[in-house]
Amino acid sequence: MSKEIKFGNDSRSKMLNGVNILADAVKITLGPKGRNVVIDKSYGAPQITKDGVTVAKEIELEDKFENMGAQMVKDVASQTNDAAGDGTTTATVLAQAIIADGLKAVAAGMNPMDLKRGIDQTVKAAVAELKKLSTPCSDSKAITQVGTISANSDHEIGEIIAQAMQKVGNQGVITVEEGQGLETELDVVEGMQFDRGYLSPYFMTNHESGTVELENPYILLVDKKIGNIRELLPTLEAVAKASKPLLIIAEDVEGEALATLVVNNMRGIVKVCAVKAPGFGDRRKAMLQDIATLTGGTVISEEIGLDMEKVQLEDLGQAKRVVINKDETTIIDGIGDESVINARVSQIKQQIEASTSDYDKEKLQERSAKLAGGVAVIKVGASTEVEMKEKKDRVDDALHATRAAVEEGVVAGGGVALVRVAAILKGLTGENEDQNVGIRVALRAMEAPLRQIVENCGEEASVVANNVRQGEGNYGYNATTGEYGDMLEMGIIDPTKVARSALQFAASVAALMITTECMITDRPVAASAAAPDMGGMGGMGGMM
């Protein structure tokens, strides 16, 4: 296929057009008074969002050269989202500002490579200054503020995220689901829960709630199917003598074995319940081992030479309480040794770092949290499906932002931190004048997020930016109320990781785009050439 090629200013102006189209659509969502974007869907209701990366991902341009520019800025938003979970709109605004000023400098005859070096030098220095300005985010109040800001000033969402982090710890697993009602609720599952219920309703002990409740049970963990009751008899006899209930977790319990367990349970000979082990294949083996670690038991597996007929009481795990319904099993207060549990959690964390799959990472994080202390589920409530999706996006953003804040601390929000960093770096110089221009391009761009927030409020950006520049420390502009003051005291804070990631990714892609001299794409195919008429088939004449 033949190619279309553009050089120099021709290529750069097309690329800038694409950047501007995407950035203009994204940046109207920035700040507390940012507007919504409505996205048409090929099925279902349109999506309403204020999430920068969601808007960016929807944009594809007809002109292939413009589209290349748009896709590169889309990459800025995606990378920032992957690294920090928020700050995608800020990153897009920064990238647009650096690219626009940088391309003007190239058109004026500056050396693109020196401009890039100047920009890179500035960003490196700015990241170091951001870390100095950062303050730790450890208390519940600060976490609430970060969540509130990231959820578009929705205090309810900030409060719920802070409560969730309080319950399961800063590193605990917090998942977001669509709720059934109008209110957003927090559901905390203490202990280890997995999505397997009882194998027979005849095991039920509480018919009102439809659950099996076992107090101080023994727990038998088996990595195979159990079909023959003879294998289970020694364990059942030992547990019956100890006058304790028994929970069996196995690949499956079927036929004669299941029927005998049900009969024993109904006659009151031994209180017992059987459930399938969670997961499949290697993941099932790993999760059985997790349960064994938590309950101080041993997984009975023929692979390591353990036979079910020789099981002793010492091989069984124990817990304070187990609650099982038709869908889930929850093990509360296993008696496992804390040092062994911590070692298992550390081992899983190493696997998370080594994993390249997002799905595997998510599953490993869930396993780690279940061992470490529980899972919190935020159930998002809304009146309509459209509102539900929009609100769920905001909760996801807020959750990522609070995690980032706990990780690297917080700085003054509303674009103020970057303005302060730019002021500190005013005296920065490069090796030549072209590098100095690159430094000035990056420093000017650092004001762009503040200016855009103010523009989205309908105020005069230059006046506000000038007032903020003249202030010191955390002094800034509260876009919600239109007042000036200490941003930290007003609760307007940004995670340092979000500000840092936005600046680094924006500058990285923008600097590369400034050094572009040639663009190549497939030449558009004419419609007539793309779909030739179907010829006649032998013996059938021409086809109409």
Swiss-Prot record:
Q: Quick check: keyword ATP-binding in the entry?
A: yes
Broad class of the protein's primary localization: cytoplasm
GO molecular-function annotation terms? ATP binding; ATP-dependent protein folding chaperone; isomerase activity; unfolded protein binding
- GO annotation, biological process: protein refolding
Reaction equations catalysed? ATP + H2O + a folded polypeptide = ADP + phosphate + an unfolded polypeptide
Where is ATP annotated to bind? 29-32, 50, 86-90, 414, 494
- Cellular compartments annotated: Cytoplasm
Write down the EC number. 5.6.1.7
Annotated GO CC locations: cytoplasm
Record's keyword annotation contains Isomerase: yes
Q: Do you know which InterPro entries this protein is assigned to? A: Chaperonin_Cpn60_CS, Cpn60/GroEL, Cpn60/GroEL/TCP-1, GroEL-like_apical_dom_sf, GROEL-like_equatorial_sf, TCP-1-like_intermed_sf
Keywords, in A-Z order: ATP-binding, Chaperone, Cytoplasm, Isomerase, Nucleotide-binding
Query: What HAMAP family does this protein's entry cite?
Result: CH60
Assembly and interaction partners: Forms a cylinder of 14 subunits composed of two heptameric rings stacked back-to-back. Interacts with the co-chaperonin GroES.
Query: What does it do?
Result: Together with its co-chaperonin GroES, plays an essential role in assisting protein folding. The GroEL-GroES system forms a nano-cage that allows encapsulation of the non-native substrate proteins and provides a physical environment optimized to promote and accelerate protein folding.
Question: Which family does the record assign?
Answer: Belongs to the chaperonin (HSP60) family.
Q: Which PANTHER family match?
A: 60 KDA HEAT SHOCK PROTEIN, MITOCHONDRIAL
Q: What is this protein called?
A: Chaperonin GroEL 1
- Gene name, Swiss-Prot/TrEMBL: groEL1
